[in-house]
Amino acid sequence: MMNKLLFFLLFSTTVFADNEIFVDQTGNSATIDLEQLGSSNLIGGTSATTTSMTALDLDGVSMTLDINQIGSSNVFRSDAIDGDNFTGFFEFDGDSNVWDLLMNSTGLITADYVDLNIDVTGSSNEADIKIAENADSSYLNLDWIITGDSNVFDFDIDYENAVNYMDINGSTNTINFTASGYSGTTASDSGYFNLDLDGSNNTLDITQSSTLARDWLSISTNSSNSNICVVQNDGGTTTSC
C-alpha cells in the first residue's frame, strides 16, 4: 500500500497544479507518512472540495500518522481518527493553511492514550480540533509549538488524566480552548494545561469544566496588550469573560 501511495504522490505532482491525498484505513498498527511540498495541496476530508474527495478516515489501534505540509494555502481535513494508542505528528510550515481534526467525535469509539505533536510555523493559519466531545479521551498527551502571527486555533477536548502543553511565539493569535470531562481523582492525574506565551495582542479564551474540578492551569507570559480569559467551572452558575 505504501508503494502505491508513494507512486500516486509522485505522479500527481507532474500532472496537477494542486495535489490531493485520499486515505481510508481500517486495521491495527498502521504507520502512515504523508508529505506535501508546495501550495494549495489537500489531504481530504468530508468537507474537502476540489474534486469531491471524501474523508481521511483512520480506524484501528496503535496507529501512527505523520503529516508534513510545507507551503502555503494547504488544507488537512480528517473525517474521523478513531482508536486507542494513536500517535500523530503534524508539521505545517507556511501561511494561510487550514487544519481540521476530528477524533472520536461521535463518542462511539474510544480514543485513549493518544499522543499528538503539533508544530506550526507561519501566519494566518486556522485549526479546528475536536477530540471526544461526546465521550472522553483518557491519558491524552497534546503538545503544541506555534511560531507566527495572526493564527486562529479552536480546540474542544473531553478528557481525563490528560496533559496539554502549548508554546506560542507570535502576535495577534487567537486561541479558544474548551476542556470538559470527568478529569482525574487526584492532582497527579487531572486535566492539565500549560501555556507559555511570547508576543503581543494575543487573545486567549480558556474554559476548563471537569466534573470533579481537578483541572490545573499554568500560564507564563511575556506579552503586552493581550487578552486572557480563564474559566474553571465544575457545574456552578454560568460564567464568562
Predicted regions, residues:
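Low-complexity repeat regions of mature extracellularly deployed or surface/particle-associated proteins
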Residues: 18-241
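Cross-kingdom Sec-pathway N-terminal secretion signals
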Residues: 8-10
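N-terminal signal peptide c-region/cleavage motif recognized by signal peptidases
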Residues: 12-14
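Positively charged n-region of N-terminal signal peptides that target proteins for export
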Residues: 1-5
